[in-house]
Design a protein with these regions (language model features):
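Bacterial N-terminal signal peptides that target proteins for export
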Residues: 2-11
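Active/binding-pocket-proximal capping segment
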Residues: 446-447, 482-483, 501-507, 517-544
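An aromatic- and glycine-enriched ligand-binding surface/loop that stacks and positions planar moieties
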Residues: 25-106, 184, 243-247, 252-458, ...
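C-terminal motif of bacterial Sec signal peptides marking the signal peptidase cleavage site
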Residues: 20-23
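Conserved, well-structured interaction surfaces
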Residues: 42-75, 99-181, 196-238, 402, ...
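Structural motif corresponding to the intra-repeat A-B loop/turn of tetratricopeptide repeats
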Residues: 177, 257, 514-515
Length: 599
């Protein structure tokens, strides 16, 4: 085996909730033109808010334009966010952990080739300022809040709930944009279309953060949000904002705001640019209280979780690698998972061949437009099954490279391995298709079966992909996350916007940054690791560094743990951005070329 060198240059800087009404009221569809209705269009607004059912449908339209992190639709007419298009590409491919070989995508054309500039058009930026449906959703939510009191046939309890959900939607859409741009114009009402001007100044980072937090605090304290929906209500209510989701989003907002991108002694560009001088892209200095705010938000969330219950990490039914894989997989992929705090849907089930859900259908070998092969750097972040770090050179010296993914035995002249033992962190196999891994993990039982992936040069699956650096296996690996195998066909699809394991790791980061509490941070990380069988204390697994005293080392381990747990969920991209890690964006990356010994 040998490592394959390759260069990627990263630049640092949806989706409908399908709720079916059983009412005899006609469904009204709200397109973007609804925004253009001025006084002459007041009849449209009057029609909508003169019906409780139409008002609910209107809120569902707001939900349908949330951020969906998997490119699934090629609509270029502004009806869905640009980030939902395979022609834009996932931001994960700008990191050190995944690559993209679809040369027509913005990620490839503008970022990999280094041609990005401020004069971009449709899909010309990883998160276009005016083409992500952010401002549409914000205005629609304000319209609902301004008109909710006059809706007949809706009691005050439901009105309070809809307003609270609308405020969560505003906060979430602002956060989606904030992570890319910093300070934003702050809207406090809808426009009628008759105003003399629409010049709204860009707010500071601090003002934008306070705006989002106030929206969430209003929603949380209103009494309109349930903490968690009962199992019987999930079929119709899952995907709606809850109190748990709102409190978790507060943790994430404070985490981003407190990070060095915005909160440091020096601005990213040196501090002398106009945007920095006006505090549009940072706080203007380091403020320790921002990490305190993040810690308080995390403590409040977990205190409420202890009191209310309703959410938990999905646990393995048996202490085996297969069941640890199953526990991790079903924790994020299942719509009714107890660890999903907020999710977004775009359609129902998918058969992998639908033109309405291209995340699957465009990943086929003949297209490879939604395929994101993992890098060798990512694969090596996953430790051995006992939790000790994987080290290529050490493994090679010990002659154990053939066991770096799994071991097994050949019985009675059979050509397939039996008694397979997965030798690495079970999450590796849930993010990466690796050589020798059986192709099926039963949806219900979690048992492995089927032919193994042949990921060597000339192998059945890889063919010449890695040798030519093209196709699904261009790096010697294939993405597993959110794609899985044929067992995922015709299952319900969604994008997890917030999940519990992320908040455990956010809590760990807040403990480290706010209190320098190494032990407390490691304890939170251990909770996440234990779910997949890594039960040995992290500080005992990493023996070449003192994680109980070396803050930089523990922070680096935490960032690695985040991408092991939250791979292909945008986490790595934003983690590198908020810590200003140009070294990882510009790192020379690798794939794996493997050869059969008898070839």
């Amino acid at each position: 085996m040998k490592l394959q060198n390759k260069w990627f240059i990263g630049a640092m800087l949806g989706a409908a909730v399908c709720l079916v009404s059983t009412s005899c009221v006609d469904e009204i569809k709200f397109g973007n033109s609804f925004l253009d209705k001025a006084p002459g269009g007041n009849a449209t607004i009057d029609t909508v808010f003169n019906s409780a059912e139409y008002t609910r449908q209107f809120l569902n339209t707001c939900y349908s334009r949330q951020y969906y992190g998997l490119p699934y639709n090629t609509d270029s007419n502004g009806n869905i966010p640009d980030s939902s298009s395979p022609y834009l590409g996932k931001k994960d491919a700008l990191t050190d952990c995944w690559s993209l070989y679809f040369s027509d995508a913005t990620v490839y054309q503008q970022y990999y080739l280094g041609s990005l500039n401020a004069n971009y058009g449709t899909r010309g930026n990883i998160f276009p300022y005016t083409r992500e449906m952010v401002w549409e959703v914000v205005r629609w939510c304000w319209l609902l809040m301004e008109n909710i009191d006059r809706v007949p046939g809706m009691d005050s309890t439901e009105k309070t709930q809809l307003v609270a959900e609308a405020k969560c939607l505003i906060a979430a859409r602002y956060f989606d944009m904030f992570r890319h741009y910093g300070g934003l114009p702050l809207l406090y009402a809808s426009f009628t279309g008759t105003e003399s001007g629409y010049e709204i100044p860009r707010a500071t980072v601090e003002e934008t953060v306070n705006y989002m937090i106030k929206m969430l605090d209003d929603a949380i304290n209103s009494g309109g949000l349930v903490w968690a929906y009962a199992d019987a209500d999930l079929a119709s209510k899952a995907g709606h904002w809850t109190k748990a989701g709102a409190m978790a989003l507060k943790c994430k907002i404070w985490q981003f705001a407190a990070s060095p991108l915005f909160n440091d002694v020096n601005g990213y560009a040196g501090g002398n640019s106009e945007a920095e001088q006006q505090h549009l892209v940072w706080y203007g200095g380091y403020h320790a209280e921002l990490w305190d705010n993040c810690l308080k938000a995390c403590e409040a969330f977990f205190k409420e979780l202890e009191s209310q219950g309703g959410y938990s990490l999905n646990k393995a039914s048996e202490e085996t690698p297969e069941q640890y894989r199953q526990a991790y997989r079903m924790g994020y992929i299942r719509q009714n998972s107890k660890e999903v705090l907020h999710s977004v849907r775009t359609n129902m089930s998918d058969a992998f061949n639908s033109s309405s859900y291209m995340w699957h259908s465009w990943a086929v070998p003949s297209l490879c437009r939604t395929e994101y092969p993992p890098t060798q750097e990512y694969v090596e972040m996953f430790p051995w099954a006992d939790g000790t770090p994987f080290d290529w050179k050490k493994t090679e010296t010990e002659g154990k490279l053939d066991a770096m993914f799994l071991t097994g035995t050949f019985k009675n002249g059979e050509q397939l391995l039996s008694e397979i033992v997965l030798t690495r962190d079970p999450r590796l196999y849930e993010h990466c298709m690796v050589n020798g891994l059986p192709k099926m993990l039963d949806w219900s039982a979690g048992t492995m079966s089927g032919l193994p992936y042949e990921l060597w040069v000339g192998g059945y699956d890889e063919g010449q992909n890695a040798a030519l650096e093209s196709g699904n296996y261009a790096t010697g690996y294939k993405n597993m996350k959110y794609y899985l195998g044929t067992e995922y066909q015709r299952q319900y699809t969604h994008w997890v916007y917030l999940r519990l394991s992320d908040i455990y790791l956010t809590y760990a980061e807040a403990l480290l940054q706010a209190k320098n509490d190494h032990r407390g941070a490691i304890d939170q990380m251990n909770i996440v690791r234990a779910r997949v069988g890594l039960k040995k204390d992290l500080a005992e697994c990493v023996t070449d560094k003192n994680l109980l005293s070396d803050k930089a080392a523990l922070l680096e381990e935490l960032l690695c743990e985040r991408v092991r747990e939250l791979g292909l969920e945008d986490s790595r991209y934003f983690d590198l951005v908020r810590y200003k890690r140009a070294d990882r964006f510009e790192k020379r990356l690798h794939g794996l070329l493997a050869y059969r010994l008898d070839d």
